[in-house]
Amino acid sequence: MSQQETHGFQTEVKQLLHLMIHSLYSNKEIFLRELVSNAADAADKLRYLALTNDALYEGDGELRVRISADKEKGTVTIEDNGVGMTRDGVIEHLGTIAKSGTAEFFKNLSGEASKDSQLIGQFGVGFYSAFIVAKKVTVRTRAAGHKANEAVLWESEGEGSFTVDTITKASRGTEITLHLRDEEKEFADEWRLRSIITKYSDHISVPVEMWQEGTPERDGPDGEKIPATEGYWKVMNKATALWMRNKSEISDEEYQEFYKHISHDYTDALLWSHNRVEGKQEYTNLLYIPSKAPWDLWNRDRKHGLKLFVQRVFIMDDAEQFMPSYLRFVQGLIDSNDLPLNVSREILQDNHITKAMRTGITKRVLGMLEKLAKDDAEKYQQFWAEFGQVLKEGPAEDFANRERIAGLLRFASTHTGSAAPTVSLDDYLSRMKEGQNKIYYIVADSHEAAANSPHLELLRKKGIEVLLMSERIDEWLINHLTEYKEKQLHSVTRGELELGELEDAAEKEAQEKLAEESAPLVERIKAALGASVADVKVTSRLTDTPACVVTGEGEMSSQMIKLMQAAGQPVPEVKPTFEINPAHPLVSRLNDLQDEAAFADWSNLLLQQAQLSEKGSLADPSAFIKLMNQMLLANLK
């Protein structure tokens, strides 16, 4: 009795199918790469499960992928004898996109074919790529270990729905038949398929086979009889683990295709490193830095990590234990000789072998990035634009490598006059003034706010470079990166400016004299502002601005407060120190005011101006506007 059901595709699948058909038309042949890759994964998964249950092989342990075409019918079939799927598995995997953050993925689509094809590639088109060339797709599958009459038939024309039915299938595994559109019949050509397999699937460790027709008996050139040959399944790829081959034998094209196979990325990797480690631990790693950040890089639920093999046997995807979180963009694999074949995520979590391998792999990736930064600054900037903000998590997470990570960071700076983050800490050190012992920086809401901050006035006048930070993560970074190569990082908006030997003796004396003369004014402002400030001081950092606010040493900065509030964390009340510039005409006129009410209004106006400049917003903007209008009106009378 038939058990046919019709199901509607998940909304996101409908969108993805539509976009793929219209966006990936320039590279249609990737459908075969994706389907062969999935078939190889199914073989890997069966091999892993059979480690503890040999019966799953059902007497056939020779795993392989077979591809055949029928020109007359216009079909291509990709068949594997891997793990197969159950009915529930078919509905789940071939009807929905089981990935977190799909809404964000679709939000990022621009409608521009070239950009969207890249994004779709990053998402991993997988099985759905079949519809790039097929008007209809038929899947027959049986899960390993299940009865022949528990197999499943899945069919769809890639529109709004698919059907599922129960069938009988003697062999385990999955068979996918693509009924090609009329304009895509080129893919039913045997030689076309062979060229695609050679191009995309040479590195796959499972044999990929195509049917080789036999030849009838025939006469040779000297009249002798050449016997007939039988047809057979011919292996079309090298079918060896690429990472176990000698580096000198592997071309760049093979490395790039293997990257696309394991990452499901649509673009080439930026760089890679292939190494065999011998000693206390023996393992091989093949690590890739992508050229583009995945669309869900910041999604907390996103899985990341390396593929783990033990003695060439696939164990698991996303083994995050071998890579710190700040390097989560790294793709690749690790093949260990030391871990047991029955290793689990729990065993990996607290294992001295894992920890030693993690340390070695982390150093390897940092070394790759250091070499790239040294040898190809332009390419490194390309990397930084994609992954720089993730790398900034490193100093908080990896104390042992803090200095190395810091050397890889890039910032905007007053030296370049550009918003582009191209300045390294070593660049900064090389330009430090004689007698300078600190690395000065500012964190603000935007590059413009940082570059135009009044806190930079004195430093600009003295020609002292300041690093300009404006990313959300910068305040977090700077809380964990307090020095570099024995030079302290010093915020120009926090505490005393501390110029040390850069401070001119005559200037210092004049500053102290001005502070002494302004003491009565400072006390008046303190009284006028009351509890709204922690203190009032004469500034040493302003030259052109009447006043600024400064965060006290040990206090939470305005940027950190914003971060905490955005995360829904409780934030303590922090009162700023208000610094005035008595040399500015506004402050000088303020000192002459005898009307204490007007004096208090002007003091408040200057304070709120300074807070607006520092934070980009006010707690009560309406009160500020009301005060401003009141002052304007009073001066217009």
Curated annotation (Swiss-Prot):
Its main location: cytoplasm. This is Chaperone protein HtpG. It comes from the Bacteria. Gene3D superfamilies: 3.30.230.80, 3.40.50.11260, Heat shock protein 90, C-terminal domain (1.20.120.790), Histidine kinase-like ATPase, C-terminal domain (3.30.565.10). PROSITE patterns: HSP90. Molecular chaperone. Has ATPase activity. It is found in: Cytoplasm. Residues 1-345 are annotated as: A. The gene is htpG. Homodimer. Belongs to the heat shock protein 90 family. Residues 346-562 are annotated as: B. GO terms for cellular component: cytoplasm. It holds the Pfam family HATPase_c_3. GO terms for molecular function: ATP binding; ATP hydrolysis activity; ATP-dependent protein folding chaperone; unfolded protein binding. It comes from Shewanella sp. (strain MR-7). The keyword Lyase does not apply. Keywords: ATP-binding, Chaperone, Cytoplasm, Nucleotide-binding, Stress response. Residues 563-637 are annotated as: C. CDD domains: HATPase_Hsp90-like (cd16927). The keyword rRNA-binding does not apply.
